[in-house]
């Protein structure tokens, strides 16, 4: 395949054109007065969004060199979204600003490598300053404020996320689903829940809810299929004498064993329910072990030399209450020791650090949440499907932002934290003039998020930035109301992690682009038209008339 090459300033200008076009589309969504962007879909209604990364992902240019620039900035937005969950527009605006200022310096004859070194030094200083300014985000009010800002000033979303976090804890799993009504709803599942229901409907003892409810039951955990009742006789006799109910969690219960359990349950000899173990393969073994630790039981597995025939009441777990429906089993208040549960959580966390698969990490996080006690489901309500998609994306953004805030703390929002962090650059000096220029490029660039927020709100950016820079601490400009004041008191907060990741990712890609000296792309293919004259040979088919 033939290639096209561009060098030096020509290459950088082409990249800059792509970056500018992408940033122009993304930056209109920034801040409380940001505008919507409508995205065409190949099927169905168009999507309306105010989410920077959604806009960035849709953009692709026909011009290959422009597209390369745009794709690199798209990577900034995606990486910031993946690691911090928010701050995609901030990252895009910062990357464009660093690149524009840097390109002017390179065009004036400065050394791109020294500019990059200066920018890197400045980013390090600003990051340290941001972390020093950061305050821990502990109370529900602060969590709600972070969620509200990230959800484009929708207080209902901020409040429901704060409520969910309060109920399931910082480690709990919060999932977002489509609702059926117009209002957002929150459902909280206390205790450990897994997606397996009763094997037979004959175990139901609450006809009203179509569920099986067991009070203070024993729990038998078996890592194999159970088909013979003989294996379980000693355990069943012990349970019958105790007068307590029994929940059996096994790979499967079938045939004679299932029939006998159903008959005993219906006659009232042993109150019992059987469910299949959650998960598959190694994950099933791990989840059975989780349940064992949560309920102070023992998994009956031939791998560790324990047989079902030799099982005793000491091997069984216990819980305060268990509810089994057609699709789910919920274990409430397992009797496991807190120290053992915490050790298990720490062990799973260590696995999360090591895994490279996002899917595995998500499943491990779910196991942590189930052990820590709680899963919350936010059902998003909306009038139309278009609104539902847009609102659901905002709830997910806000959820990521609040998690980031809990992790690394919060700083004043609205671009104020970056303006305050400029102080860290006052005493910073590079090894030469070109590095000093790199530091100054970043000094100007970190004003750009506030400038864009103010511009989108219809105010004069330079006036606002200068006024905010004259003051100290959390003093800033509320673009939603047009008022100046303490940003923290007004509830305008940003997670430190989001601001930090946006700056680091933007500077990383922008300085890479500044040091680009050559670009290589495929030449566009020339479309070869099919000659219509070739069809002339078909005329010979006229002789087929004789076939009639």
Swiss-Prot record:
GO biological process, one term: protein refolding
GO CC terms in record: cytoplasm
Compartments, record wording: Cytoplasm
InterPro entries: Chaperonin_Cpn60_CS (IPR018370), Cpn60/GroEL (IPR001844), Cpn60/GroEL/TCP-1 (IPR002423), GroEL-like_apical_dom_sf (IPR027409), GROEL-like_equatorial_sf (IPR027413), TCP-1-like_intermed_sf (IPR027410)
Coiled coil feature spans: none
First-level EC class: isomerase
E.C. number: 5.6.1.7
The entry's keywords: ATP-binding, Chaperone, Cytoplasm, Isomerase, Nucleotide-binding, Stress response
Residues where ATP binds: 29-32, 50, 86-90, 414, 478-480, 494
Catalytic activity: ATP + H2O + a folded polypeptide = ADP + phosphate + an unfolded polypeptide
Gene Ontology terms for molecular function: ATP binding; ATP-dependent protein folding chaperone; isomerase activity; unfolded protein binding
One Pfam family hit: Cpn60_TCP1
Subunit structure: Forms a cylinder of 14 subunits composed of two heptameric rings stacked back-to-back. Interacts with the co-chaperonin GroES.
Similarity field: Belongs to the chaperonin (HSP60) family.
Function, as annotated: Together with its co-chaperonin GroES, plays an essential role in assisting protein folding. The GroEL-GroES system forms a nano-cage that allows encapsulation of the non-native substrate proteins and provides a physical environment optimized to promote and accelerate protein folding.
Protein's UniProt name: Chaperonin GroEL
